[in-house]
């Protein structure tokens, strides 16, 4: 068994606080503990196009309250996932469209892990799921977990 976080592998996990994303983080934590991979829990901050912002662009003045809420949600998801204590978990907030941001974040990494369905709601069902987009476009292997 590899030492915690010393294998050089990074497992990227998409986390939005939904049950499937927490299940994905839990699985990734066990995988990271078993392989020595670092687990990077990623929360994507997405501004809908209706907000009048260019896709994938963060406004110059970031709303600190919203960013703090994102950090709290990510921290809560890590707590709910109850990852193996020997797993090396890091957290990150990125900005952009969820599927594209996760694909970008996982580029050059060992594995991308996502839940089968997140908080995308009806619009996600119409446009295709983030999980399917990741499976079809990520450069690394993708694990999709049901929660």
Residue ranges and their predicted role:
Residues 58-72:
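A short acidic, glycine-rich active-site loop
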Residues 69, 93-97, 117:
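Short beta->alpha linker loops
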Residues 40-42, 90-94, 143:
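General small-molecule cofactor/ligand-binding pocket signal
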Residues 56-60, 109-110:
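Short, hinge-like loop/turn segments at secondary-structure boundaries
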Residues 35-38, 87, 140:
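Short glycine/serine/threonine/alanine-rich loop segments
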Residues 2-57:
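Small/aliphatic-rich secondary-structure junction motif
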Residues 1-7, 20, 79-112:
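Structural beta-alpha unit
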Residues 105-147:
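Gly/Ser-rich helix-loop-strand patches that form or flank binding pockets
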